[in-house]
Structures are given as structure tokens and as C-alpha cells.
Amino acid sequence: MKIPLKWLKEYLPTDIQPAELAERMTMAGTEVAVLNSHKDKWPNVYVGQIMEVNRHPNADRLVLVKVDWGQGQETVVTGAPNCKVGDKVVFARTGAVLIDGHNGKEIVLKPAVLRGVESCGMVCSERELGLSDEHEGILVLPADALVGMLASEYLGEVILDLELTPNRGDLMCVTGVARELGALIDRLPAISDPDFKATGPDIKEKIEIEINNSKLCTRYTASLIEGIKLGESPDWLKERLIACGMRPINNVVDATNYVMLEFGQPLHAFDYDQIKSRHIIVRPAAEGEVLTTLDGVERKLSPDMLLITEPDRIIALAGVMGGENTEVTEKTSRILLESATFDKQSIRKTARGLKLQSEASARFEKGLSYELAPIALKRATQLILEIAGGQAASGLIDVLPNKKERNGIVLSLAKVNQILGYEKEPPDACKIAKRLGFIWLPEYVPGMEEFGYGATEDMVRIYPGYWRMDIETDIDMIEEVARIAGYHTIPCLPLDKAIPKIETPPLPGMKRFLRQILSGYGFQELISYSFTSREMLSRVSSGAEPEFLAISNPMSSEQEVMRTSLRPSLYASLAANRRFEKDGLRLYELGRVYLPKENKKQEEPEMLCAVIAGGSSQSRWQRNTAGFDFFDVKGIVESMVSRLGLSADFVVSDEHGLSHGYQAGILVGDMPVGILGQVSPQTADKFDITEPVYMFEINLSKLITRAMVRRKFNPINRFPAVERDLALVIDRHITNRQVIDILSEYDLVKNAELFDMYQGKQIAENKKSLAYHLLFQSDTHTLKDEEVDGVMSQILGRLNTETGAVLRS
């Protein structure tokens, strides 16, 4: 938000230097930078004075102007009709950077010979300086302009550039900044209630206003001005609009923009003669309605948008932009001026839904008090009468369906000191409230003493100004006390107790640990948007149409739904990065997915998904060209889960998107927590992946419930272990997991590890050989061979009964 300092001083006269002023406001919570509106512009451009004006010897429409620019005199050839001896003008020397009056592009001024006469410079118009589109004549400066001064210094103005926080919509205008600065320097700004002289008929005879939804439009005020003359605004008004970053258009539109910058209330002018019905209705849009706005674009409307209409047609998008059908044009002689208060959520949805952000919508989105509407309307009417002429109808249209009484905020002065930490000489909260323009009264609240907030005489009721919509509770008011008194006045006190130890929540702690583990395994983390497209998710979904959580106002078609899986972003990233990575690539992502449910709620589990592709070794000397396989990713999962203090088991699975026979479900205890396997060629092809890719996916929201189980300490076994090897011939369809499950049921078997598998000529065609290394150990005594032999016999018998396995000879 840009505010000219001269304009600000009209409401709050002060001798404070701009840098100090900016420092005070910055330290009070609003960052301010001091700018010069024309600093570093117009090199070699000076204030000059016309000494002579002579006719051009070879051209009737050109004149020779001799200009004194403080360091000498130069002769300039110009066709400007308003050159007079003694006038102060803007003189540009050779090398100056100006705007070409014909095409609007920047040019570097060079020496020129015009009709046989050398021109050493230029006397400039407003357009050539970039101040406006005016180029019919040169810019004539006031008589007090100092000859020889740089034009950037003379025409420049100190501008305050405010970086506003979302809650301070009141600072989006000059009067709001004046109130803020006035509170900081303890001086009330001179802001009076405007009014205008009405000489026309009663406005109620000319127009009828109706509000159909008082929640979306809390107040609608309007005035009528007849006999206006549309034209260019005066220079002072145009200069202020330009300094604030706005483009002058015509005197009526400029007046509404000026008042918006002055008071913060957006206004809109309708061509009254185009409102044929003389009846305005404020209502929500109906499905399928359209409106051509002032920018000439036909816009499709939705029911959550608020409209200004006649009974049979739409004439404006409330709070955002007017309609082309009631636009003020050169033929306009009567205008209806609107100043209304619209619901901020409604305006935000409309502006974003139509991608139509404006200065007006930005102010409505922050929230405006309905008390501001008639004040700004009177000021705008007054200004238009001043610069565009005409007669104002008597009175105002003021539709206020539900007037709300302000209850004020009950504040304990003791609580102010308690919250801010003052012990001696605390700031006077009542005086600060007065400096802010608020009203305060003594308050009696029975029973507050028992809460430690002070006796009856300690309580006050504060009524914030209507412009401070962000002051709602006593804590808000306490913040104002700290801001205005100065944060530097709050005493620094030593801690009176130890800082409590806050334990890291289990899930964030697990995620941090997993990042460390995966980083050690050579993985790189991917962070993608939670928003994605239906098309992207459908690539990893089964044939049935999947359900998604749709976003009501997506930024683009590629971010229209919430993700239900991390796989698409990982596969797409893998495909994009494999072109630049010759060795193996390992990627993972930690994040939530959003799963819709029938009861219109949703699950948001925290997931870990990882992919690996390429060579399994990056060591150049090793020259290992073997690629990753199923057992690599299985080993990573086993090791990772083991480092969490858990044990992973694997079961046969049939997950869509993974190759049949090269996938497995992940169990921790008896709980399914994830899946791993090779990405199917069909799915890989959808992401333009041409090589084998392996992945694993784990539901951390489930895994954490197992990791949180407190584990008991087991002492180191002091009895020796006995090792045996067991080679079995077994049917090919029997899995290693089935054998391991049987072996693990025997207490003396502490570990069983598959170390060999064979299929070949020496074994029947439908059989295979599995060889296991078994570790036997007792917790209470040293095992004897007879005891181990007995357990081995039991194992062989059970394996034979349940799987048909026999001991390999």
C-alpha cells in the first residue's frame, strides 16, 4: 500500500522525518519503506526557465525556445503551442531517458537537426515524463520552481510503502494510516465527517433499493448526481492517484478511486439512465447466469456470487466489478453512486473464482464496517460535485436491514500488566485507547475478583473504532497497548522456573528417524503438492472410477483434487530424473493422503512411499552392473523396520499396479501396514518408464501404533547355541514364509535363515530344494544333542504333514 506523505500530512500535520516515521510504524508492527516516487528517474532532466521564444525560420508550426537550465542556456526546437517567456518548464538534456510520445517506449534523447536548426534537448510534456497521457503541450511548473534543480527532486514526492498484515485492512487508506501514526505520536488526526450540498429532488423518488440477502450485504447506500460533465480530473487528483499506483481514467471514476484510497471504502458509479427499471436488487446469482463486465469479458456466474441487478438483468458483480451495460461513458450525465458493505467471504470466493482480483475486492476481503459506507458516499458525492459539477439529489438511499449495537470489550487493567509482564509504571491502557480513537468507560463485572483480574475499579469497557474490525477480545486490546506503548518498554525478566521439557510426539519423531535411515540408504526425499489431477491418480488406480476429494476453487486443472496416493508424484519424478542420473536412483516421500469415506468425512493417513531403479551399486571400481531386484527392496524394508525395533513379515498379495508374483504385503505383528514389489510394466508405461522399478509403501499411521508399544529388555543369553542345517525337498508352490512360520513356533529355534534354493535335474520337476541354517538355544540351560535331535524330528514331522516336505538326501 503506497501513501503519499503530503496527503497524510493533510490529516496529521507533523515535522517527523520520513525515516523516523517509518521506523516508528515498523516497530509497531507495520513494516514501512520510504520511497521517492521519481527517485533515479529522468537523468539529465532539470527545471528550466524559458528565456526566449522565436519562430522557426523554415517551419510555421515549430518554434525556437531558449531555455536556462541553471548551468547554461540551450536552444530547443518544439511544436508545443503553450511556450511562454518566463514559464518554468522541464528541460531534458542530451542523454536523458524519456517516453516516446507516439509509441510509449523509452528512448534516449540524442542531438537532432529539425528543419535545418539544431535542437540541443527537449522541453517535456507529461506523457514524455511518464506522468500521464497528456501531450498536447509542455508541462508548465509553478513559478516557485527552482531553476537548475533535478526534475526528479522537484516533481518527486515522499511515498510511504506499507507491507500490511492480513488483519490490518484499516491501513489500506490514508485516514487509517493517519489514525495509526497519530496513536504512535499521541496526536489525534483531523478527520471530519464529510457532507455535500443537495439541491435536487428527493432521491427516494428516483430509485428503489432492495436487499434479498442481509447476510451477504449488510448495508447499501447510494446517492444520485445529475448534470455532471465527464472529463479529465484536475492535476492534483491525478498526481495522487499515480503516486498511489493507480491510473487516472476520468473525473467520476477517479473520484471514486480517490475516496477509496482516502477512506478505504470501495465505491461504484452507475450510469443512472441505463437503469431503466429504477429498481436495484442485491441478490445471489442463479445457476447459469452470465454478465459482461467492464473489461468486456462475458463471465459465467455461480450461486455463491453476489450480484447487483435490476428485476430483469444483472448490472454488476457486487464488490468486484461493474457491468458493461451500466458503464459510465462520455454520454453520461446522471450517475448513481454506490457505497455498500458486502460479506468478505463472498467477495473472496467471487474474486478468486473468476480470477478477477481488484483494489475493491482486496478491501472487501479484509472486512469493512457498515458504518463506513455512508461516510465514504458523502465524501465521494462532495468530490464529484466539486470536479464534475452537477446537482445532488436530496438525501441518501440507506438500506440497513440489521443494525448491530456495539457491546464493547471488557478489559482488566491488572490483566494487561499480567500478560505483558509490567511490574512498575505500566502503560495507561485507557490513554492508549483514547490515542487510538477508541472510547472507554468504567465497568463493573461481578465475580471477576476471584479470577485474579482485579477489583471493580480495575475494569473498563472499551469501544473500538468502527475501522478496527480486528479488535474483538481483551487480548486484542492488550496487544494494542503493547504496540502503541512500544514493545521495547516491556521489561526483560529472568525465568522464574525451568523450561518444561516437551516430548516430541511419536509420529513426527518417527518421521524424523525414518528420514535419517533412508538418507543412510542413499534415498533422496521428494516433496510434492497435496493437490493433483484426476488423470494423474487414475494412472495408478484400478479400472473402477476412483473417488476423490475435489477442490472447490482449484488453481489449475492439474491441481483439482486431493491426492489419494503418493505413487503418481514419485513415478513422475523418477521418470523425469532418470534422464540425468546414470546410476541407481532412490526416491521417497513422506506425506498425507486424503481418502474419502461414505459419511462425507475422510481419512488422512501419514504415508511413506519409496521407489528404486537402475543399478544397485554406484561404485565405479566395483563395476557392478546388476540392477535392483525384489529382494533389494525387501531387504531395505526389513532393515528399516528392524531399526524401529520391530519385525517385518511378508505375505502374498495381489495389489493393482504391481507385477503378479513380484510383490508382497508387509505385516508388523498381525497388522498389515504396507506393500512392496515391482511396478507393473503397464503402470510404468503410463509414466514413460522403460526399466524395472521397485517400490514400497507403508502406512505410518498404522506403523506408529506398533512402534509405540513399550518393549521389554531381554538379558543376553549366557547359554551356548547349537547350529544345525536343514535341507528340504518341497513342492514348488510352498513359500519360504510358510516354512519360516512353522519353524518360528518352536521356542528353542531362535533363528531360521534360508541360505540356498535349488531347482534342477537332480530334483523332480514340480519340486524345489530349500536349505535353512537353524540356531537352537535355551534360556535356562545348555542344550544336549539328544534334545536338539528331538526338536529336529518334530520339525520334520510337522513340515511333512503340513507341506509335504522331506529331508533332502
Curated annotation (Swiss-Prot):
It catalyses: tRNA(Phe) + L-phenylalanine + ATP = L-phenylalanyl-tRNA(Phe) + AMP + diphosphate + H(+). Binds 2 magnesium ions per tetramer. Mg(2+) binds at residues 470, 476, 479-480. Keywords: Aminoacyl-tRNA synthetase, ATP-binding, Cytoplasm, Ligase, Magnesium, Metal-binding, Nucleotide-binding, Protein biosynthesis, RNA-binding, tRNA-binding. Residues 404-492 form the B5 domain. Its cofactor is Mg(2+). Signal peptide: none annotated. Tetramer of two alpha and two beta subunits. This is Phenylalanine--tRNA ligase beta subunit. It comes from Dehalococcoides mccartyi (strain CBDB1).
